[in-house]
Amino acid sequence: MSLKFILGTASYDHHQALVTNLKATFQEKPQERYFYLVPNHIKFESEVSILEALKSDENDYVAASQIQVFSLTRLAWYFMKNTPYYQIPRISTAGLNMLVFRLLQEHQEQLQLFRGEVRHTGFVAQLTKQLLELKIGCITPADLTAMAENLGDQQVELAKKLHDLTIIATAFEAAMQKRFIENTALIDALTLFLQQQTLTDCHFYVEGFAQFTAQEQALLTTLMQQSEVQIGFILDRAYPNQQPDGLNFFFQAGRTYYNLYQQARLNHVPVMMDQMADSQRLTPALAALDQFWVSSESPGNRKLSPVPVADHLHVVAAENRYAELRYVAREIRRLVQTGHYRYRDFLILTRHLAPYQTMIAPILTEYEIPYFCDLPQTMAAHPLVSLLEKLLDVNLHFYRYEDVMALLKTELLIPKGMSIAEFRADLDLCENLILKNGYEGKDWLNDFDWQFYRFGSYQEGTRTTQDEALTERINGIRRYVQATLPPFYRALKAAKTGRQVVQVLYQFLIDHGVDRQLLHWRDQALAANQVAQAGQPEQTWSTFMQMLDEYVTLLGDVSFEEDNTEQLNEFKQLLSAGFAAAQYAQIPSTLDQVVLSESGMVQTKKRQITFMIGSTDQVMPDQIENTALLTDQDRQRLLDNEGQVTPLLNESSVGKMNAEPYLNYLAFLSSQTTVYFTYPLGNGEGTAFKISPYVERIRNHFDLTIQKIAAEQSLQSTETPQGSWRSLLSDLIQVSRQAQENQTLIPEQWLTTYRLLQQAPQSQFLTTQLFQSLNYRNEPERLTPEIVTGLYGNEIHTSISKLEEFYQNQYAYFLKYGLKLQERPVFELTPANTGNFYHEVMDRFIKLIQGQQIALPELDDQQIDKLVSEVLAKTYEQPEFKILNKTARMGYIRQQLMQTVKRVSLALRNQSLSTNLRPLATEVLFGQVGAEKGLQGLNFMLDDHREVKVRGKIDRIDQLTINNQPYLGIVDYKSSQHSFNFRDAYYGLALQMLTYLETVLQDQQAILPANSAVKPAGAFYLHLKNPTLTLKQLTKKKMGQLQKGEFDQMLLDQFKYNGLIVNDEELLENLDTTLVNGQSPLFAFSKLKSGKFSSKQLVTLNQLDLLMAHNEDLIKEAGQAIFAGDTALNPIMRPDRTNALTLSPFKSIFQFDAMLPENNYRQLEALDEKAVLERLMSKKGDGNLE
């Protein structure tokens, strides 16, 4: 028979030449068979094109039963569909992975390099791909053995790799024999089958390939021996006697020509004279691009005179990918509206579509452009896949919160009789309670119901009928899980083989209606005319069924141990890997649509305009990395040792890089008239991109101007607006906002656009809505008196910390305490929980020693340890601290908390040996807190008979008596380092200590009834911690203490009291009775050699009065502002740039943007204690600071 080549560069129409030849032969021999072979993904378009070409001038219809357009695998179906071989089951990628997984386990003792790799994620899939590459390249296990024998002594690792590949490949071939067919084996089988057939009446026309695998070349050799074969190559000339140099621009096509030519000679097949495609398919501009590109990539490239290409070559730089894709959509729509183009005339190409994947649908939908994206979409994200993974994870991780919720949120397991809306609402309630109480593990399996309670300052734990109803709904979900999953897991545990595991899983899914729910989803998608989505549920279920069949066939007889947890995990991983490799079959929904694809995929040549998007130096040329088991170095070593076999492997990274100019050349010339090169200048996240060197070379040669596209429409643009009504509305809003900011008029063309959008029924409502946003200012409105009264009444009962929050940000106060918004409660140990724990323990500890009438200085270490252990045991029983008993991690944290409490208790004892200050009372209430009352609260009358009542709880009140003069001080426990900040006190951010001190002084009779003239000692912070010392902190004095074993004394200054201290010499002497001079280890002051005391924390009684008076003013001013309805969005900004927004849970509500003129931080000045006191004295009108 014969072989004929159709050659020519990309400028020429190889398709037309082949179809013309086919048509001529068909008219001469209409009874013979004709096959047009193309890559699979362009088969449909090629068939349509060929049928169009075969129509006669007189008849619009053509009967072409003798003409078939096939891919190579479809050709196998055509010839072999009725043979016994073709009836053997196909094996999927998932099945291949399962088979390779089994082979690795069976042969692990023989393996040298791969023995321990089976457990590594991704290795099985990587090995499977390598085996398929060897099979496609027709490299047998015997070839691998020969390769290994030819390696030198220095190539030990490669020899081990080939040794293991030989073992697995041999076992792979044996396991597949007559049991399964995988797609690559079909080509071999077809070749063998056709060798036994008569094909003299057949004609084969091959187009769209630049190279063939070894399998495909063997098939073509068989075809040319028995039939007429014509192959079209984009190739500048013939290479009958010698393949081109590796750096030759047409290397791939030239090498393929040479190999096929040599096969024809070897098999005595006549080679017809080459036919040069002579029909120019490109405009002169693109033909000039063809000449230039080929010339520039060829040695000694000759100078070419540029031709006018302005209307057919464009280079466009957009601000980001979003602006780039919007420009492409706008341009396509503009060109279609000229009436000269249809949507099917456009092709959008890029090297990798992934960076654009999230933008394609919204932008093209906005511009009302029908499109088809031929990027394969995997099934990994389908809810069925998540259901299967989480169904097994719940068992593997024993009802972990994340797994149970993910399982239920697939919405494939729903209680019978419950609507999807009811299920979602109940599941949300259930999840909230789970997060609040930390339910997981055995909590799902207990017999008693979970209880829903409301807790808060305004709902004191009282249960209502509504609470009971919500409790029932929540437990409906819990009972469903309890009734559904445990029986399934018991059945899984009882399974003895892989086959039984599959039976249990399949029956569970059928019994619970998963298959019916998937069909329901399909019907919903069809009803909504979502054709692509409608096919996904059935395709995913079908893939799953095939994987189960393959698992049973390959691993069904594998025994499962009694504790089969690890084997079930492997089963889950095999399913996950299978779905990750499985892809949806994609069907174009219409003929007239824009196609998006990647430049590495072959395209038909009938389109008019190509947009090469993403033309940056990152991907053009692409940065190629070889991830196969046989690395580039391995391939080079094999090439050096085994030159005949190695070329049958896939190209190395270097070979693929060398092919980049040719691959992009095909993409540049994929359409007939025009090409747009577009690229983003950045990714919108700070990364800048450069133009592709390929495009830069083209631009320089043809002297093209780069068109710049901004992210937003320009106010100065005079162009007529283009786009759909939805895209025009987006652009109009941008232009209007710019005009508003620049205080200029909107251009006339945009005013016209506005009028049209307002008149059109489909756009009228949204236009009105969006234009309202132009007048929106991100600033809260002042509350009306009615709303204020409704929220707060006429009395504000508040803790002082709430008012501190008001001074941090008024709007945050309104959200939290006016609207009572709160974050969803989560079962975790927060800093607040830790603080409550410390407060509870210290309260119990002080009250215990007071109740037993034990003097703190008299306690020894053993007594303290016993007392602390008693206190901790009772504290752990409190419901709010049950989290400490929940997990092993919490157990560790509990140990740390216990060590801290013991260390603090020892520190209190040690401090008591050096001070006369003694704890008097702990956790002292003032004002009304819930149903409890304590000391008299601070009440402040405001205008309009309104009142602020401050309440709270003082951690500890200490007492000291000097010469019958009682002193009272307050102590506030902190879990982090604190000191009194005069600036924060001045701005209302630190009201607590002064308020507590004023409360104690105000109600001193209730504290010390027998005394009438109590003086303040100070207000102190105590940092509760288990301290560690750095080397820098180990002074000579501390080293001496350490050597003497005085460890407690060495750590004494780690528990120093910081805060306000009254500057009273007699008082200070009694606060630290052992201080001779230097820094006190107990309090934040030092004693000079002169006998005087020094500290920035010292204040006189007069200064303390000033601070407390200012504190009162701040409380009253906050109350006045709250009752006035002030809700300003005014977060504070400290001099160190920390601000009130950093940790706020309401940031998504604030929408605070410092770039907006109405959003401003309230800047705090950097005031020290002297500056604060001076301002307070000035406010009082007294210049005396003492």
Curated annotation (Swiss-Prot):
One of its GO terms (molecular function) is helicase activity. Its EC number is 3.1.-.-. InterPro entries: ADDB_N, DNA_helicase_suRexB, P-loop_NTPase, PDDEXK-like_dom_sf, PDDEXK_AddAB-type. Transmembrane segments: none annotated. Despite having helicase-like domains, this subunit does not have helicase activity. Keywords: ATP-binding, DNA damage, DNA repair, DNA-binding, Exonuclease, Helicase, Hydrolase, Nuclease, Nucleotide-binding. Heterodimer of AddA and RexB. The lineage of its organism: Bacteria, Bacillati, Bacillota, Bacilli, Lactobacillales. Pfam families: ADDB_N, PDDEXK_1. Gene3D superfamilies: 3.90.320.10, P-loop containing nucleotide triphosphate hydrolases (3.40.50.300). Its cofactor is Mg(2+). This is ATP-dependent helicase/deoxyribonuclease subunit B. The heterodimer acts as both an ATP-dependent DNA helicase and an ATP-dependent, dual-direction single-stranded exonuclease. Recognizes the chi site generating a DNA molecule suitable for the initiation of homologous recombination. This subunit has 5' -> 3' nuclease activity but not helicase activity.
